[in-house]
Every structure is written in structure tokens, then in C-alpha cells.
């Protein structure tokens, strides 16, 4: 009876999702058309980054699972990342959840397709009573391949582009990670990185062997001199070697799947697109996340701060991250909060000194570079001064506002300043 109830729940869920997809499909066509009209600059970069984020999160009470997610377009002319979060999975017992980050290239359609349809393929392959762990690993492998085949059937033959993907499937006993390409996941356990996915690049021995066996070449570290990743959804022009199954094509949609037995020391899992990993290592990000959790920061706000930090560190790509916190995640610490407040106060005093020592307030970039050259204690591990960019910008803006008001009163507007946004804090260097 329980199995039948779960099957009915899944059927109802599928019907609801079909209606949602019809509406989303119309919205996607409008977004794609707007994207085609967007002006193309050098490397498809904007003149200023788009920093807007809509962080969101949730919690699953029975299993102690919390998550946060956020995304930012950054300097790119188009947003090609997508993600999805499921705290519960229809048709499966409590304690199962799914999270995915997808990073598109050559357009956003493949990533959006994956975010909307890959969970359904996973559910279909799992069935109502999945066997762990090998049955689930095989189900994830089949789900990626079936989703890729479905995408091929929907796309015109002239369509180009694809996406990388990293999926975290949580069960009460295991953490399953399935990934294609360079979207990455890191597990923190007992204060250290316990597991990290490895990017699928053409020069990895296994990838190189498959590419050459399928008649392909590797030039400039890229498949056929063009594609930087060797596994992806979509990219069907690289999947036409005759007589070879999908997993043995030049570019494969077959994921690498890991099954990690859950432990009480598990703290959190961070999933992110390469716009995040390009600027900060996995170990550094894990340290930064742990330090922010000790401040009591909600996972979704923490994700937003991570993306701001990566933007300030120089990321030029779209950025998406999902933080999944387990019961063993670091808890708020009064000492950590006290030290953070002291750091903010010290930064405020130093910025005031820098502005007061000049005839007119220096630019925000000058203030930031000056602070970066100084030895400031207790900066966030892994994030450094970049993690405090928002605080610095807010303090600077307040000081300039006071200076403006004083200038208006004293010299009829003389001495006004024109503060810039830390955009992320520093102008993009040529």
C-alpha cells in the first residue's frame, strides 16, 4: 500500500510539473530571444557586472538538512547557469533530497533543460524502492544518459551548446554525487575537505583515450580545439561517431558517480559552477563557509556572500552555488561573532583615517587597495579582505555622505565626493 501511495504521489507530481513546464517553456523562449538581441562585446563581457542575486533556502526538519542557493550573472553578457533544489522527492520515503547546478555554454537552453527535467529522469530511474548504493549509482548514470537523449530529440540538428552538471542526491544513509564537466562539489567533514569531484578535462588519461578512440583530437587542451570539457549534456556535434554508444563518444553525457556513506562528522556540501571555483580553491571555500556558519549566517545569505567574494576576487563568469548543511555543520560561536564585530569596527576606523588624511576622500578602489596592502588580523579564512567588500563599501559610502553634507554647508557644495560601488569592489583590470 505504501508503494502504491508513493507511485500515485509521483504521478500527480509529474502532471503538475508538466503544466509548469509549459508555462516555463514560453518564458524560456522570450528569454532566449532577448539573449539573441543582446550586444556581443569582447569575450561577451559587460561594461559593469550584474551583481543582483535572489538567494533562497529551506530546511527539512526530520533529517536536520538545511540548504541555501544563489546565482549571479556577473560580467557575462548572458546568464547561462541554472540550478534546482528538492528537499523531498515524490514517491520516495522521507530523507531523500536532490540538488543540482548546471553551467551552460553556447547558450542557456541545455542548462535550463537539465534543471527542469533531470530530477524527473532521476526519479524514473530510481523507482519507488531504490537499492543502495550500487542501484542508485546506476540509476544516476542512466538518468544522465536518458536526459541527454531526450534533449537530443527536442533540439534541431543545427542547435549548438551544452552544459556541465553536478548533482547531489541525499538519502538517509548515503550522499551520491554525479557530475559531468567542470561544475564541482566539495564535502567538508570534521573540519577538512573529505571529498571533491574532479573536473572532466580532455587531458585526463581516461578522457583522452576515449576522445582518441572516437576519432577526435585534442588541441589547445580542448576537444577538437574548441570545447574545454570532455563530458556534458548537449554538445551533440561531438556525439556523432558512428557505431559507438553514447558513453564512448568524443564528449560523453555519462556522469562520474560517487557514493559516500554518511557520517556524523559530515558538515556541509558545496556545489558550484566554475565561475566560483576559478577564483577560490575547494579547501579555501570550505574554510570560508565554516567561518561564516560560526557567525550564524543563514545558508542562503552565505551563498550570496560567497558569490560577492568571488566577484571581488576577479571571477568573470556566471556564478551559481548551493550549500547543503548537515546536522554536523558548525554552529554559531559567541567568540567568532565577537571577533567579526571587532574586525568590522577596526575596518571602519581605518577607512575613516584614510578619508580624513586626504584633502578629499580617496576613491573606493584606492581605499580597498590600501587596505589590501596592510596586515589586517582576523580576516575571514579563504575569503580575506574580498569577503569584507560589502562592509567596506557601506562604511565608505557613509563617510562620503557625511563629507558631502559638510561640504554643502561650508562651501556651497565644494568638497562633494562621487563614491563608486565596489563592483564588486575593484574595477576590472585590463
Curated annotation (Swiss-Prot):
Residues 17-26 have a biased composition (Basic and acidic residues). It is an enzyme of class 3 (hydrolase). Mn(2+) 1 binds at residues 103-104. Residues 16-65, 407-430 are annotated as: Disordered. InterPro entries: PP2C, PP2C_C, PP2C_C_sf, PPM-type-like_dom_sf, PPM-type_phosphatase-like_dom. Its EC number is 3.1.3.16. Binds 2 magnesium or manganese ions per subunit. Its cofactor is Mg(2+); Mn(2+). One of its GO terms (cellular component) is cytosol. Keywords: Hydrolase, Magnesium, Manganese, Metal-binding, Protein phosphatase. Mn(2+) 2 binds at residues 103, 274, 317. It catalyses: O-phospho-L-seryl-[protein] + H2O = L-seryl-[protein] + phosphate; O-phospho-L-threonyl-[protein] + H2O = L-threonyl-[protein] + phosphate. GO terms for biological process: positive regulation of canonical Wnt signaling pathway; regulation of canonical NF-kappaB signal transduction. GO terms for molecular function: magnesium ion binding; manganese ion binding; protein serine/threonine phosphatase activity. SMART domains: PP2Cc (SM00332). Residues 66-326 form the PPM-type phosphatase domain. PANTHER family: PROTEIN PHOSPHATASE. Belongs to the PP2C family. This is Probable protein phosphatase 1N. It comes from Homo sapiens (Human). The lineage of its organism: Eukaryota, Metazoa, Chordata, Craniata, Vertebrata.
Amino acid at each position: 500500500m505504501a508503494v502504491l501511495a508513493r507511485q500515485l504521489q509521483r504521478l500527480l507530481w509529474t502532471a503538475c510539473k508538466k503544466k509548469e513546464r509549459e508555462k516555463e517553456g514560453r518564458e524560456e523562449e522570450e528569454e532566449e530571444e532577448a539573449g539573441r538581441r543582446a550586444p556581443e562585446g569582447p569575450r561577451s563581457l559587460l561594461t559593469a557586472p550584474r551583481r543582483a542575486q535572489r538567494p533562497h533556502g529551506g530546511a527539512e526538519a526530520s533529517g536536520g538538512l538545511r540548504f541555501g542557493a544563489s546565482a549571479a550573472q556577473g560580467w557575462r553578457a548572458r546568464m547561462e547557469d541554472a540550478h534546482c533544489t528538492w528537499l523531498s522527492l515524490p514517491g520516495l520515503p522521507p530523507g531523500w533530497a536532490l540538488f543540482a547546478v548546471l553551467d551552460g555554454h553556447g547558450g542557456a537552453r541545455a542548462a535550463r533543460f537539465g534543471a527542469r527535467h533531470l530530477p524527473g529522469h532521476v526519479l524514473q530511474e530510481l523507482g519507488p524502492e531504490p537499492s543502495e548504493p550500487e542501484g542508485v549509482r546506476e540509476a544516476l548514470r542512466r538518468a544522465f544518459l536518458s536526459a541527454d537523449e531526450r534533449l537530443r530529440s527536442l533540439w534541431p540538428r543545427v542547435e549548438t551548446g551544452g552544459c556541465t552538471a553536478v548533482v547531489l542526491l541525499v538519502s538517509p544513509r548515503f550522499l551520491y554525487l554525479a557530475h559531468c564537466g567542470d561544475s564541482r562539489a566539495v564535502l567538508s567533514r570534521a573540519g577538512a575537505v573529505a571529498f571533491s569531484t574532479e573536473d572532466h578535462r580532455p587531458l585526463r588519461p581516461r578522457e583522452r583515450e576515449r576522445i582518441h578512440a572516437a576519432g577526435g583530437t585534442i588541441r589547445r587542451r580542448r576537444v577538437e580545439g574548441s570545447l574545454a570539457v570532455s563530458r556534458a549534456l548537449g554538445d551533440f556535434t561531438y556525439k556523432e561517431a558512428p557505431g559507438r554508444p553514447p558513453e564512448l563518444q568524443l564528449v560523453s553525457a555519462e556522469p562520474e558517480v560517487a557514493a559516500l556513506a554518511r557520517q556524523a562528522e559530515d558538515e556541509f556540501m558545496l556545489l558550484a559552477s566554475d565561475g566560483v571555483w576559478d577564483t577560490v580553491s575547494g579547501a579555501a571555500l570550505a574554510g570560508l563557509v565554516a567561518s561564516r556558519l560560526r557567525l550564524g549566517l543563514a545558508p542562503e545569505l552565505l551563498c550570496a556572500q560567497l558569490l560577492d567574494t568571488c566577484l571581488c576576487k576577479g571571477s568573470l563568469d556566471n556564478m551559481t552555488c548551493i550549500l547543503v548543511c548537515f546536522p554536523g555543520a558548525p554552529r554559531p560561536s559567541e567568540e567568532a561573532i565577537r571577533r567579526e564585530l571587532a574586525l568590522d569596527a577596526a575596518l571602519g576606523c581605518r577607512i575613516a583615517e584614510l578619508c580624513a588624511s586626504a584633502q578629499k576622500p580617496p576613491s573606493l578602489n584606492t581605499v580597498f587597495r590600501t587596505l589590501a596592502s596592510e596586515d589586517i588580523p582576523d580576516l575571514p579564512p579563504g575569503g580575506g579582505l574580498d569577503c569584507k567588500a560589502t562592509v567596506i563599501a557601506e562604511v565608505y559610502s557613509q563617510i562620503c555622505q557625511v563629507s558631502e553634507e559638510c561640504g554643502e554647508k561650508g562651501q556651497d557644495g565644494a568638497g562633494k565626493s562621487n563614491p563608486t560601488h565596489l563592483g564588486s569592489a575593484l574595477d576590472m583590470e585590463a
